[in-house]
Design a protein with these regions (language model features):
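Domain-level signature for proteins that mediate thiol-based redox and metal-cofactor handling
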Residues: 1-160
Length: 160
């Protein structure tokens, strides 16, 4: 199989690998996949963790290997977590942002600067009239907010 075709197939397959903590969003949509390389009988995927201590990393690695082995049963699959560049919330694709909203999770603002006021739009009614209930949500990457317009609590991805 031609290497370029194989690389494209790997990227397409990785779009099926969901973030275990955000099951409507793929690791590609989250901007976690840094690179894909195919050489001979080997496929290597480099993944940027959203947070260094993320407890889902082992599951993500297992899912990547499982999906790629189904496509390339004879290939050696290698998954590496890379820390040479940090993941930022700007890496989330537009499709990923929409899928987060469908799940009731507000995506982070684009081009957020540390120290800047964090304005979060409600994923249900799209109102900016929201308040932070708890900076610490169910995972390290999420916070809990409340919409004063539609009266719904919701989670938001922290901007980094």
């Amino acid at each position: 199989m031609e290497t370029q075709i194989k690389v494209e197939e790997v990227w397409e397959t990785l779009k099926q690998v969901k973030d275990p903590e955000l099951p409507t969003v793929s690791i590609v949509e989250m901007g976690m996949v840094k690179d894909v390389r195919c050489q001979g009988q080997a496929v290597e995927v480099e993944i940027i963790p959203t947070f260094v201590g993320c407890p889902a990393l082992d599951l993500i690695k297992k899912d990547v290997v499982q999906h790629l082995k189904a496509l390339f049963p004879e290939e050696q699959i290698k998954v590496r977590f890379v820390l040479d560049i940090p993941w930022t919330s700007d890496r989330i694709s537009e499709e990923g942002r929409e899928n987060l909203k469908k799940m009731g999770i507000a995506p982070p603002p684009r081009e957020y600067q540390a120290g800047q006021k964090w304005i979060v739009e409600c994923p249900y009614c799209h109102s900016p009239k929201t308040v932070m209930e708890n900076l610490f949500g169910p995972t390290a990457c999420r916070s809990i907010l409340y919409c004063t317009k539609c009266k719904n609590p919701f989670e938001a991805i922290k901007p980094v």
